[in-house]
Curated annotation (Swiss-Prot):
<dbReference type="InterPro" id="IPR003699">
    <property type="entry name" value="QueA"/>
</dbReference>
<comment type="function">
    <text>Transfers and isomerizes the ribose moiety from AdoMet to the 7-aminomethyl group of 7-deazaguanine (preQ1-tRNA) to give epoxyqueuosine (oQ-tRNA).</text>
</comment>
<keyword id="KW-0963">Cytoplasm</keyword>
<keyword id="KW-0808">Transferase</keyword>
<dbReference type="InterPro" id="IPR036100">
    <property type="entry name" value="QueA_sf"/>
</dbReference>
<dbReference type="GO" id="GO:0008616">
    <property type="term" value="P:queuosine biosynthetic process"/>
</dbReference>
<comment type="subunit">
    <text>Monomer.</text>
</comment>
<dbReference type="InterPro" id="IPR042119">
    <property type="entry name" value="QueA_dom2"/>
</dbReference>
<protein>
    <recommendedName>
        <fullName>S-adenosylmethionine:tRNA ribosyltransferase-isomerase</fullName>
        <ecNumber>2.4.99.17</ecNumber>
    </recommendedName>
</protein>
<keyword id="KW-0671">Queuosine biosynthesis</keyword>
<comment type="similarity">
    <text>Belongs to the QueA family.</text>
</comment>
<dbReference type="InterPro" id="IPR042118">
    <property type="entry name" value="QueA_dom1"/>
</dbReference>
<dbReference type="GO" id="GO:0002099">
    <property type="term" value="P:tRNA wobble guanine modification"/>
</dbReference>
<comment type="pathway">
    <text>tRNA modification; tRNA-queuosine biosynthesis.</text>
</comment>
<keyword id="KW-0949">S-adenosyl-L-methionine</keyword>
<dbReference type="GO" id="GO:0005737">
    <property type="term" value="C:cytoplasm"/>
</dbReference>
<dbReference type="Pfam" id="PF02547">
    <property type="entry name" value="Queuosine_synth"/>
</dbReference>
C-alpha cells in the first residue's frame, strides 16, 4: 500500500506551537468510525459521549527531560544528546548531534562535570550507546540538566514543562508525551468517575520511533521501532470486567491502543497482565481485537499514526475528517485538538 494514500494538505499555521491555557478547552471532533459522520465539539463535551460502564485506558508514562547539552572533554565541542531507551544500568541508546564527532571512547561532560557519558558503541539508525557516570540519583540530575524533547515541528519555547505531561503521568521513561492525554484535567477525570466511567492505566514508554517518518515507499516495507509496555493484573481484570458487562474499552491515544492490541494479539484475543517490547504496526486491513473507541490528536501526513486511525475507521473517513479539520481550522499535532473515533450511531440507537 502506497504511503502517499495517507497524505493531506496541512497549512503550517495550523500546527499548534503552544498548549492552550486550559487543557479541556481544546476542540474535539467526534467521528463515527462506520458512517464517517462528524460532529464539532469541545473536549469537555467528551462527558456526554461516554456512558456508565465504559472504561478509558490511559498511558501513565512520564516524559523525561531527555535532551542534554554537553561538551566533548577533549575538544570542548558542543554535543546534543537525546536519550531514547535505557538498556541496562546506566547504559542508554541515544541520538547525538553531530553524531560524526562521537566515536567509541568519546567522553561527553554535562553541567560542568556533574554528569558524564562515555560512548561504548553504535545503535540503530545512526544512534550511539552511552554509559553515564555521576554522583547521586540519575533522574534528579537529569531533571536539573535536561530539557523536554519537544518534537521538531514545535519552534516555540515551552514555558511550563508540566504542560508536556499528562496530569496522571507517573512512570518516567518516555522521550515524548502521549499527547491525547494532555486534554484531561483532574476535574474532568473526577467527573468521568462520578458518571461511572472506569479509568484503567497502562504504561508504554514513547520512543522517537512513533514519530519517525515512514522511509519506505510502501507501508508493508516499514518497520516500527520497539517500545516498552506494561499492563498490570489490576488493569487486565478491570478491562475484562468491562467487556463481560457490555461496556466499551476506549483507549486514550495510539500508545494505549498499541499496548492493548499487542497483548490481545499475543494472547489469542485476551487481555492479561503483560510486559515486553512492541513493534506492532496497525494500518488498513488490521483487525482490532481489544478496543471499541479511540481518543487521539490530529497526526502528521503519511505518519504511522494516521495509518493506525485509518485502520480503526477507514482511510476515506479519516482523510475526509482531516480535510474537514483543516477547513475548520483545528489545531494539529502534539499541542493540538483531539478526535474521538467510535461507533457513535450504534450507541445512540441502543
Amino acid at each position: 500500500m502506497d504511503i502517499n494514500l495517507f497524505d493531506f494538505h496541512l497549512p503550517e499555521e495550523l500546527i499548534a506551537q503552544i498548549p492552550l491555557e486550559e487543557r479541556e478547552t481544546s476542540r474535539l471532533m467526534v467521528l463515527d468510525r462506520e458512517t464517517g459522520d462528524i460532529e464539532h465539539k469541545h473536549f469537555a463535551d467528551i462527558l456526554s459521549y461516554l456512558q456508565e460502564g465504559d472504561c478509558l485506558v490511559l498511558n501513565e508514562t512520564k516524559v523525561m527531560p531527555a535532551r542534554l547539552h554537553g561538551v566533548k572533554e577533549d575538544t570542548g565541542a558542543h554535543i546534543e544528546v537525546l536519550l531514547l531507551k535505557q538498556e541496562e544500568g546506566d547504559k542508554w541508546e541515544t541520538l547525538i548531534k553531530p553524531a560524526k564527532r562521537v566515536k567509541e571512547g568519546t567522553v561527553i561532560s554535562f553541567g560542568e562535570g556533574k554528569l558524564k557519558a562515555t560512548c561504548i558503541g553504535t545503535a540503530d539508525q545512526g544512534g550511539r550507546q552511552l554509559e553515564f557516570s555521576y554522583d547521586g540519583i540519575f533522574y534528579e540530575i537529569l531533571d536539573e540538566l535536561g530539557e523536554m524533547p519537544l518534537p521538531p515541528y514545535i519552534k516555540e519555547t515551552l514555558e511550563d514543562r508540566d504542560r508536556y505531561q499528562t496530569v496522571y503521568a507517573k512512570e518516567i521513561g518516555s522521550a515524548a508525551a502521549p499527547t491525547a492525554g494532555l486534554h484531561f484535567t483532574e476535574e474532568l477525570l473526577e467527573k468521568l468517575k462520578q458518571k461511572g466511567v472506569g479509568l484503567a492505566f497502562i504504561t508504554l514508554h514513547v520512543g522517537l520511533g512513533t514519530f519517525r517518518p515512514v522511509s519506505a515507499d510502501t507501508i508493508e516495507e516499514h518497520h516500527m521501532h520497539a517500545e516498552y509496555y506494561h499492563m498490570s493484573e489490576e488493569t487486565a481484570a478491570l478491562l475484562n470486567r468491562v467487556k463481560e458487562d457490555g461496556g466499551r474499552i476506549i483507549t486514550v491515544g495510539t500508545t494505549s491502543t498499541r499496548t492493548l492490541e499487542t497483548i490481545a494479539t499475543d494472547h489469542s484475543g485476551k487481555l492479561c497482565a503483560a510486559s515486553g517490547w512492541t513493534d506492532i504496526f496497525m494500518y488498513p486491513g488490521y483487525e482490532f481485537k481489544a478496543i471499541d473507541g479511540l481518543i487521539t490528536n490530529f497526526h502528521l501526513p503519511k505518519s504511522t499514526l494516521i495509518m493506525l486511525v485509518s485502520a480503526f475507521s477507514n482511510r476515506d473517513n479519516v482523510l475526509h475528517a482531516y480535510n474537514e479539520a483543516v477547513k475548520e481550522k483545528y489545531r494539529f499535532f502534539s499541542f493540538g485538538d483531539a478526535m474521538f473515533v467510535a461507533s457513535h450511531a450504534k450507541m445512540r440507537n441502543k
